[in-house]
Amino acid sequence: MKISIIGTGRVGSSTAFALINAAVADEIVLYDLNKEMAEGEALDLLHATTFHKRMIIRAGEYSDIEGSDIVLITAGAAQKPGETRLDLTIKNAKIIKGISENIKKYAPNTLIINITNPVDVMSYVVWKVTGFESNRVIGTGTILDTARLRALIGKNCGVSPMSVHAYIIGEHGDSELAAWSSAMIGGVPIKGFCRNCPYKDNCNKDLSKIFDDVKNSAYTIISKKGATNYGIASATTALVESIIKNEGRVYTPSVLLDDVYIGYPAVINKDGVERTIDITLNDEETEKFESSKSIIKEYLESIKNLL
């Protein structure tokens, strides 16, 4: 299994390290415009393989991604404190277009996972420029947001996050929403669980506050350390594992719906996106989801001259 990573900044290098720990690849190729950084990361990561599965780790050129089973895109301008993901659109669209052209040239049969923000818009750019089938172009979408939601619900309600089934859908950004109508804890609708929870009298957070914490997580982290990297690296690795092992896990990646890439529940297997799963949304949630789609489409309109 050969995986290539385009971009070896914090996210790219953290993802490479997570992939090593997961032992899912036989070869990892790192590419970056800063060749010395890519070479340094490759050497450092190679040393880490001493304690894990034996694999090839090397820096390379675009031509070295040939034969890749999966290509991960992490390159792009960094999100600055106070800057929304959609503010990055024009800046990163040109970068992603060039990367996509090279992937199409050197690895036409690969499956692409885009991590670069704004992830929904950039995933659409990758899809349009490469001309690949939509199941082979996946964005990380709201996978990490969903994980954050489940973790915070679990902490607040005194249960394991693994027993929480709740989704963040829509844009990976300011217009995302929590699909509370379909949220469950241990098979019980979450609002029913809350009514019968023995800790309800001492609970100091309602559902909207939990969602606000999820929505602001990235901004909080960026304001304190400058970037988010470990969470998204783990989310990407989980996505890769479901593809490589053909596990059919359900995540909320950025997938093609109504000619727009957007975070939505989907089954992920060896072919990428096998299918989406329709979840129950009330009228308010449906309206918010459609609004989120419209926002992404507006930003796509702003870069249509590049595609």
From Swiss-Prot:
Q: What is its EC number?
A: 1.1.1.27
Please give the superkingdom of this protein's source: Bacteria
Record-linked PROSITE patterns: L_LDH (PS00064)
Give the keywords, sorted. Answer: Allosteric enzyme, Cytoplasm, NAD, Oxidoreductase, Phosphoprotein
Which Pfam families does this chain map to? Ldh_1_C, Ldh_1_N
Example of a GO biological process term = glycolytic process
Q: Where does beta-D-fructose 1,6-bisphosphate bind?
A: R150, H165
Return the PANTHER family for the record.
L-2-HYDROXYCARBOXYLATE DEHYDROGENASE (NAD(P)(+)), L-LACTATE DEHYDROGENASE
Protein name listed in UniProt? L-lactate dehydrogenase
Name the source organism: Petrotoga mobilis (strain DSM 10674 / SJ95)
Q: Which gene encodes it?
A: ldh
